[in-house]
Design a protein with these regions (language model features):
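Bacterial N-terminal signal peptides
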Residues: 5-18
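N-terminal secretory signal peptides that target proteins for export/translocation
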Residues: 1-2
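Amphipathic alpha-helical segments
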Residues: 40-56, 101-108, 154-170, 228
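Mature N-terminal segment immediately following signal peptide/propeptide cleavage
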Residues: 26-60, 64
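Well-ordered beta-strand scaffold positions
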Residues: 70-71, 190
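N-terminal post-signal-peptidase region of extra-cytosolic proteins
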Residues: 74-77
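Vicinal oxygen chelate
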Residues: 20-27, 30-40, 63-66, 81-150, 172-197, 214, ...
Length: 267
């Protein structure tokens, strides 16, 4: 075990888990689970996500960065590019004390993009990760994921697919920059926001955001339903290489969004 891994494991052992862990699943037994990033420098990402408020945790051999509602996983790998240009353009978090968080980011030298709204903007993460931020003083925790933003050519079709497959609730989600609402599908843990793209964007595999993870209770039964509905299952039920209590599978949506289905990702 190298020094960086040892430090990460020690921090994980001492860390107090962030409020709860993942959201209570919906009627389809699905909730947001994780976001998996392919990165050039794991240590740089550990530093970045710590600055965002993440806490290192371990599920046996699986190192993760925990936020309320989601785990961030990082893996060293070559990529085809950042999030912009892929069907998943960015994802977003809300901070209870945004001015304090922004002061920390500025001290660390991270690039911040804002318009006239002091309560909203974007931060440029390593490897072309685009992260949206907003302030929400009503939060019960310091920071929480609030959405993943997808850009299909056909928004109603994508809404219908995620509603049927993941049991999400379609509607409008209100954001700082869109008070009238953005088309979305609500999944426990976060909104899947959807905006129309004039062209078909790149699929996520091989990008810095390689895939989105959803935690599923009773994964074998869920996969049987996926087969019956004709969902593209790219990898069937498989034991995890990192945790004996976890099993995984992979599916892909019709727009090229790679998704990992997990059961047992939480420590």
């Amino acid at each position: 075990m190298n020094v960086m891994t040892s430090v990460f494991a020690l921090a994980a052992a001492l860390a107090i888990p962030a409020a709860a862990q993942l959201a209570v699943p919906n009627d389809a037994e699905v909730s947001l689970g994780h976001i998996h990033l392919y990165v050039s420098d794991v240590a740089e990402h550990q530093k970045f996500w710590a600055a965002m408020g993440g806490v290192p945790v371990m599920n046996q051999k699986l190192a993760m960065i925990q936020f309320p509602g989601v785990f961030i996983l990082v893996r060293k790998a070559e990529t085809k590019g950042g999030t912009v240009g892929s069907v998943v353009n960015h994802f977003g978090f809300a901070w209870k004390d945004l001015p304090a968080a922004m002061a920390k980011w500025q001290t660390a030298g991270y690039k911040i993009e804002q318009s006239q709204d002091p309560n909203h903007g974007y931060i440029a993460g390593p490897d072309g990760i685009r992260l949206e931020f907003s302030g929400d003083p009503s939060l019960q925790v310091p920071v929480k994921i609030n959405h993943v933003h997808l850009y299909p050519q056909d928004v109603p079709a994508m809404q219908a697919w995620y509603t049927k497959v993941l049991g999400g609730v379609p509607g409008k989600c209100v954001r700082e920059r869109a008070p009238d609402g953005i088309d979305c599908v609500e999944i426990p843990g976060a909104s899947l926001a959807m905006s129309k793209s004039e062209t078909r964007l790149d699929p996520t595999p091989g990008r810095s955001l390689d895939h989105i993870g959803f935690e599923v209770k009773n994964l074998p039964e869920f996969l049987e339903r996926m087969k019956a509905e004709g969902v593209n299952i790219t990898q069937g039920l498989t034991p995890s290489n990192f945790s004996s209590k976890m099993r995984v599978a992979f599916i892909t949506d019709p727009w090229g969004t790679k998704m990992e289905l997990t059961e047992g990702i939480a420590p």
